Amino acid sequence: PQLLQTKATYDSNKYAVIISGGGNPSVNYPRYWNDCSSIYQTLLYTYNYDSAHITVIMSDGTSSNIDRSTGDSSPLDLDGNGTNDIQFAATSNNIKTTFSNLASRLTSNDYLFIFTIDHGNYDSSGNSSLTLWNDENLYASTFAPWVNAINAKAINIVMGQCFSGGFISYFKNNPKVSISTASTKDQPSSSMSDGRYDEFVYYWTEAVTKKASSGYMVGDVNQDAFTTAHEAYDYARTHDKKNEDPQHYSSDLLSHFLALNGMRARTTSGTIAVERGETFNYSGMETINWTIPLNSPVNISIKFPTNIVYKWNCSSGNPGNFYSSSSTTASVLANSSSTSPIVITAKAD
């Protein structure tokens, strides 16, 4: 559990939607509530979200009827502070209305985090859906346009339901979306062995919440105080031991910069080391060039600090083999036989 805090101010440009459909009382397992409670507290007490900016849509909403497999009603208070946090029943109409309101409210300065959990389906036509209350199916083809209509600076989506990977393709034309899922489009997802949480979302949440001895979050590999969507996904994927294959997508390397506490800067400074022995200093968005002499084959292996993303380009000449990568490493085998030198460019993005 999180340490409850009372804050005078919150980050006004952060919004979140938490959805757990549940299906029906016989299959609405308590772990779904646990998953939602954990991420809800993380947003409030670790990342300074305003509770007024978090919409929680869960099973039968505020009803006191039995809605869980344990024969009780889901507690409405997710963080133990005495205030009800669950607002709406998990119906497609409530979800549509929530996203429509956000589309009217959010601007290009705002961030949106979307978290979904419980059951999912995969039909004979290969369509994935999120199971809502009363076993209603919300298909990816319906869900995605509601989200894509929101003009936020960036949208970070984490999905833990079965067959969640089927939602990814519907966001590939939106450069503002990063999406991580617990499984592929035709694969179930799994709970943890003790049944208290779901495997993938548990470790995703741990990546952005649990502190290592260094003082940084365990998922913050480069220790820059931003556990990015990609770092959190990678941490969850490597710790996930169940029979599921987590998936991830974002365009233009968005997930390397997007985190729950905002967007880390795309500029930095440091040193680029080259295997041949040269060292190139760079600062911010500066472009680094080096020239391969004529008729002198050179095998260059370059390794950068892991907190930077690089774009590569062979700007002139005729390399025998140029391996380009937008990750943190790249190699060049330059067999120069052209009449002009080969110039390879690495640019910190």
Language-model-detected regions and their locations in the chain:
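Solvent-exposed loop/turn segments at secondary-structure junctions
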Residues: 22-26, 60-64, 118-124, 135-137, ...
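Acidic, glycine-anchored loop motifs typical of Ca2+
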Residues: 28, 32, 68-86, 128, ...
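Short, compositionally biased P/S/T/A/G/V-rich stretches that sit at domain boundaries
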Residues: 262-291, 319-322
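Solvent-exposed segments in extracellular or luminal domains encompassing
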Residues: 328-342
